[in-house]
């Protein structure tokens, strides 16, 4: 069976592992998934990211982060732009997630950026996902 939206599958794997309090989640690797995982690491939503190279596609391993009492750091993940309905934003209309408490990951001409970085660089693009 052909997967129509590998990014949604990647986000769903993270969401399900997070809700089940797993410490590690693995998914097939791609450049955009690596970029999303690195942004999640830089923004403090996950502990670490490893890319395991094999002779095929590779595997991306994400170490999830929890608070001192076991509370989730990632409260929500939502796929915004989908293959059937792409969502783009102009540079003036870059969204804020929960008034800045969350992040929007945007695919721009300069690569994957958070909403904050896109606002600073004054560029728009395709809104991939919201994380809070």
From Swiss-Prot:
The keyword Ribonucleoprotein applies. PANTHER family: 40S RIBOSOMAL PROTEIN S15A. One of its GO terms (biological process) is translation. Belongs to the universal ribosomal protein uS8 family. GO terms for molecular function: rRNA binding; structural constituent of ribosome. The gene is rpsH. Keywords: Ribonucleoprotein, Ribosomal protein, RNA-binding, rRNA-binding. NCBIfam families: PRK00136.1. InterPro entries: Ribosomal_uS8, Ribosomal_uS8_CS, Ribosomal_uS8_sf. This is Small ribosomal subunit protein uS8. It comes from Streptococcus mutans serotype c (strain ATCC 700610 / UA159). It holds the Pfam family Ribosomal_S8. It comes from the Bacteria. Part of the 30S ribosomal subunit. Contacts proteins S5 and S12. The keyword Transport does not apply. One of the primary rRNA binding proteins, it binds directly to 16S rRNA central domain where it helps coordinate assembly of the platform of the 30S subunit. GO terms for cellular component: ribonucleoprotein complex; ribosome.
């Amino acid at each position: 069976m052909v997967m129509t939206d590998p990014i949604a599958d990647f986000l769903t794997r993270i969401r399900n592992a997070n809700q089940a309090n797993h410490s590690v989640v693995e998914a097939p690797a791609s450049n955009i998934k690596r970029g999303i995982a690195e942004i999640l690491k830089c923004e403090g939503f996950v502990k670490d990211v490893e890319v395991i190279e094999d002779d095929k596609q590779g595997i991306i391993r994400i170490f999830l982060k929890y608070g001192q009492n076991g509370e989730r750091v990632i409260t929500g993940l939502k796929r915004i732009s989908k293959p059937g309905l792409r969502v783009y934003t102009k540079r003036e209309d870059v969204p804020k997630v929960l008034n800045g408490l969350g992040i929007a990951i945007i695919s721009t001409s300069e690569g994957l950026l958070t909403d904050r970085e896109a606002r600073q660089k004054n560029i728009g693009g395709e809104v991939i996902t919201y994380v809070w």
